[in-house]
From Swiss-Prot:
Protein name as it appears in the record: UvrABC system protein C
Pfam family, one: HHH
GO MF entries: DNA binding; excinuclease ABC activity
One annotated Gene Ontology cellular component of this protein: excinuclease repair complex
Organism for this UniProt entry: Actinobacillus pleuropneumoniae serotype 5b (strain L20)
NCBIfam families noted in UniProt: PRK00558.1-5, uvrC
Main localisation: cytoplasm
Gene label: uvrC
PROSITE patterns in alphabetical order: GIY_YIG, UVR, UVRC
């Protein structure tokens, strides 16, 4: 039993971070404090603040502390520990994806494109946008308003004539000389920059001046082009909310919390424009109060993933934060500019946006609660069907290939809350006869299970997408395993599609019962199985398509001896891309600079037989 009195005797009155461990030496909670002794002493009073704290203290085996120079340093260290260890009793932000941006590259003829990840590519970044769909929508709009290129560099460098985008007025064709000047292209790039910075008025003023100049020079075709561009920009302005006050860069956060489930909704405003919104559902330990949730979420959201996220000038939230000043100081240091946090007395247009965020948070939470109810119903139905007391982990396998080529196996994982995408796996299947799905399934199962597994990674159910043959092969594979964990624990279930391969007509083959089950189409258990099976199928197909595309590309030029990067580029440039190379005659290939007659014959023969 943990001796709190002896431990507290040696804890100093200094700022720092503490880590609480259970009997398995697993970190179950991470916290910080201005005064470690006072904070840690509060856990061992006779009357504790909440049931959550009681449960936490009951599981403490030992505590470690780290003294820091300041509360600010403690705040950073705390969130690093939380991100690394994902403690059971901390509020955890489950979303760990980087956010997409719009990138304006630093080329002679800049390209505008979407970008996600660390900002290593030279250029100007605009965002972040809440999702890839918002970026695509903005890029489509920009292409209609400003005709600058969005194509890949490899495509741009190998053009000998303008592409379709030029023909329909969506690009100035900078890839080919003689169509537009560098100055004209630079002008459109500058308009894109102004538009993305929220300076729509300057864009219109600039275009009006250009239109008037063209009219004075009697270049009525150019004047008409500028007129159409002005009308398009103004049409966009009319659809967007125009604020009476300058909003600049800010995030507006509202939290809705019911029945142990929280929704944090964020509106992203950049350069005075709302780029979009997004809802988050952090993992919240039982009996967590709202103030702790607000403090922890804001810290995690901006500190744990700051390398991929732009920290705005201001953060507005509808919950009081206990450490506003300390958090603002840390964020300012991380962002390289002053960051203010407002958690009260919000007025003007900002209050309108905060109300909008609150409405969205409550609506998203209501929907999530309904979905959770449906998920629980499906799980309860499946437990009853299979006569299982509990289902902690389910895995499902599927095989995908084209005529036996580029075979890929997938494994998806579900728990009682739905998909565990961080545990999804794909396996490249090699060394088997093409189209042998049984051998492919065996190889996938061996790759995943023929090794030591932690107790929590052992599935309760393994679904095999296939009939009796696939299931029997899976059973044989499990029998052959020589592992330390209990290989008899997983229940293997085959999911056969039926004669007409229609959803709702599946047959379940239960390994331990040696019997088939036909469920009615409205069965909640069947709906859960279909969801898992479809997720596995989609995961396998996605992996297979990537592998097939890679094989298709490499079957062209990369695999031919004597064709390096320069010759490959010359072939693509002179023959009009890969399709042109494949359609070219021997004489046409030989006419490409740097390609000898002998090499042309090798290229021609390889492509004809690939």
């Amino acid at each position: 039993m943990f001796d709190a009195k002896a431990f507290l005797a040696d804890v100093p009155h200094l700022p720092g971070v503490y880590r609480m461990y259970d009997a398995k030496n697993t970190i179950i909670y991470v916290g910080k404090a201005k005064d470690l002794k006072k904070r840690l002493s509060s856990y061992f009073r006779s009357q504790l603040a909440s049931k959550k704290t009681e449960a936490l203290v009951a599981n403490i085996h030992h505590i470690e502390t780290t003294i820091t120079h300041s509360e600010t340093e403690a705040l950073l260290l705390e969130h690093n520990y939380i991100k690394e260890n994902q403690p059971k009793y901390n509020v955890l932000l489950r979303d760990d994806k980087s956010y997409p941006y719009i990138l304006l590259t630093k080329h002679q003829h800049p390209r505008i494109t979407s970008f996600r990840g660390s900002k290593k590519v030279a250029g100007e970044y605009f965002g972040p946008y809440p999702n890839a769909g918002a970026v695509r929508e903005t890029l489509n709009l920009l292409q209609k308003l400003f005709p600058i290129r969005q194509c890949e560099d490899s495509y741009y460098k190998n053009r000998s004539r303008p592409c379709l985008q030029y023909q329909i007025g969506r690009c100035l064709a900078p890839c080919v000389e003689g169509y537009y000047s560098q100055a004209e292209y630079d002008n459109q790039v500058n308009l894109v920059r102004l538009f993305l910075q929220g300076k729509d008025g300057q864009v219109v003023e600039h275009l009006v001046q250009k239109m008037e100049n063209a009219a004075q020079e009697l270049d009525f075709e150019a004047a008409a082009r500028f007129r159409d561009q002005i009308q398009s920009v103004r049409a966009v302005q009319e659809k967007q909310f125009v604020s009476n006050e300058r909003l600049d860069d800010l995030d507006i956060i509202s939290i809705a919390y019911q029945h142990g489930i929280a929704c944090v909704h964020i509106l992203f405003v950049r350069h005075g424009k709302v780029l979009g919104n997004r809802s988050y559902f952090p993992k919240v330990p039982n009996n967590t109060d709202l103030s702790e949730l607000a403090d922890t979420f804001v810290g995690q959201f901006y500190l744990q993933m700051n390398q991929h996220r732009t920290i705005p000038n201001q953060i507005i939230i509808d919950q009081s934060l206990s450490e506003v000043t300390a958090l603002a100081n840390v964020l300012s240091e991380q962002a390289g500019h002053k960051v203010s946090i407002a958690d009260k007395n919000i007025r003007g247009d900002k209050s309108r946006y905060l109300a909008l965020a609150k409405t969205n948070a409550e609506a998203a939470l209501t929907l999530q609660l309904k979905q959770d109810t449906h998920i629980r119903q499906r799980y309860d139905s499946l437990k009853a069907l299979l006569n299982l007391a509990e289902i902690k982990r389910m895995e499902c396998f599927d095989i995908s290939h084209t005529m036996g080529n580029q075979t890929v196996a997938s494994c998806v994982v579900f728990d009682k809350n739905g998909p565990l995408k961080s545990d999804y796996r794909r396996f490249n299947i090699e060394g088997i006869t093409g189209g042998d799905d049984y051998a492919a399934m065996e190889q996938a199962l061996l790759k995943l299970y023929d090794r030591n597994l932690e107790e929590e990674k052992i599935p309760d159910i393994i679904f095999i997408d296939g009939g009796k043959g696939q299931l029997n092969r899976a059973l044989e594979t499990f029998t052959s395993l020589n592992v330390s964990w209990d290989k008899r624990k997983p229940l293997l279930v085959g999911v056969a599609k039926g004669v007409e391969r229609k959803a709702g007509l599946e047959t379940l083959l239960i390994s331990k019962w040696d019997k088939e089950i036909h469920l009615p189409p409205d069965s909640p258990a069947l709906h859960l199985i279909q969801h898992i099976r479809d997720e596995s199928h989609n995961h396998a197909i996605t992996g297979h398509r990537k592998k097939r595309q890679k094989a298709f590309t490499e079957s062209g030029l990369e695999s031919i001896a004597g064709v390096g990067a320069k010759r490959r580029q010359a072939l693509l440039k002179y023959l009009g891309g890969m399709q042109g190379v494949k359609a070219a005659t021997l004489e046409e290939i030989q006419s490409v600079p740097g390609i000898s007659k002998q090499l042309a014959e090798v290229i021609f023969d390889t492509l004809q037989h690939s």
